[in-house]
Amino acid sequence: MANVVVIGAQWGDEGKGKITDLLSRSADVVVRYQGGVNAGHTIVVEDKVLKLHLIPSGILYPDTICLIGSGTVVDPKVMIKEIKMLEDNDIDISGLKLASTAHVTMPYHRLLDLAMEQKRGDQKIGTTGRGIGPTYADKSQRNGIRIIDLMSREKLQERLQVPLSEKNGLLQKIYGIEPLIIDEIIEEYLDYGKQLKKHIVDCNRTIHQAARKKKNILFEGAQGTLLDLDHGTYPYVTSSNPVSGGACIGAGVGPTLIDRVIGVAKAYTTRVGEGPFPTELHGSINDQLCDRGGEFGTTTGRRRRCGWFDGVIGKYAVEVNGLDCLAITKLDVLDELEEIDICVAYELNGKRIDYFPTSVEDFEKCNPIFKKLPGWRCSTENCRRLEDLPPAAMSYLRFLAELMEVPIAIVSLGANRDQTIVIEDPIHGPKRALLNS
């Protein structure tokens, strides 16, 4: 048995969906532990492109339990839409489970998210506008609605009175938005509750029953390390904890239950929305990476900002998450480049530093110091073994492993499942018996 956490080692969009899908074949339970519909992952199965925001990638395996955990925030309308999409594609969803204690994104959360972002003007933080921050804020203020509240008209009405009154006041007086009607919300969300009822479970009990039976449990994070509320580029962050420690809180398990932590990183770096990005590219190479990599957000459709691989934030992700190994994705996107830069340090106020500064103001001043490596100028898309890779591509991967001081377990060379080199099974293989030198 091995219980594994999969996290993003950059600013999200690293390709966690594909890696989770790959590892789900060996998992009995897949748990999404934080975030909401602000995340998105794309999975390709038999030429079908499936875009999911809430439901874990493991849903594609009929014998796998897929649990949306207590640490998530759930937009039930989106979840029901995803369920229908999966059913329309003849995918068995009997293993889909939803924590009764997960918090619910309400209509006023979405309205406030968009209104607040608009009011920030040039101070905007790049929110997806899906109501995630306001939902987590209500959770912290103990004003939130939970999935279990959708099971009872009386309970929902009782729980909704105070927050809706407060939010209607804000919407009207500050943002000039018409107030929401409580009876309409109650009817809508009770209906969502009826549709989701068969999936609702006790999250903690479900996970610990599986653990007692020595089942393999895969914990799936959304977003990435540098978007973590406490450890990311604050305030340009999400409202939860995507780092590996967030799995314990969001799923309700102790750290001793976790056996391994796998970090997913692109062979280059991307970022969506606002915030500093030291290795960001502009011009033709940026366009090439964006076009070849299909760098448009699953959730927002926004064009992603592209840059060279940043080893400084990579090493930071290794430390913050306690990574055991890495999965490197989209290596094939670099196939046509003559030369490739890797950021090995920063220059800040005339001094060389090799650490991630905690001040976002300092981070904005950081200039990357690059190591230049030769490109391989040939396709890697059909490589299925390490020895199939061009020597320059192998050298690139070895340099990444050495720079980040953690071995590489998986290399992804395209969106399809079979476009993958598994150097060592991160779930069943021996720890650290991987590509690291």
Curated annotation (Swiss-Prot):
Pathway: Purine metabolism; AMP biosynthesis via de novo pathway; AMP from IMP: step 1/2. GO terms for biological process: 'de novo' AMP biosynthetic process; IMP metabolic process. GTP binds at residues 12-18, 40-42, 304, 330-332, 412-414. Its EC number is 6.3.4.4. IMP binds at D13, E14, G15, K16, N38, A39, G40, H41, T128, R142, Q223, T238, R302. Mg(2+) binds at D13, G40. GO terms for cellular component: cytoplasm. Substrate binds at T298, T299, T300, G301, R302, R303, R304. Its cofactor is Mg(2+). Transmembrane segments: none annotated. The active site is at D13, H41. Its main location: cytoplasm. Keywords: Cytoplasm, GTP-binding, Ligase, Magnesium, Metal-binding, Nucleotide-binding, Purine biosynthesis. It catalyses: IMP + L-aspartate + GTP = N(6)-(1,2-dicarboxyethyl)-AMP + GDP + phosphate + 2 H(+). Binds 1 Mg(2+) ion per subunit. It is found in: Cytoplasm. One of its GO terms (molecular function) is magnesium ion binding. Plays an important role in the de novo pathway of purine nucleotide biosynthesis. Catalyzes the first committed step in the biosynthesis of AMP from IMP. Belongs to the adenylosuccinate synthetase family. Homodimer. This is Adenylosuccinate synthetase. It comes from Prochlorococcus marinus (strain NATL2A). The lineage of its organism: Bacteria, Bacillati, Cyanobacteriota, Cyanophyceae, Synechococcales. The gene is purA.
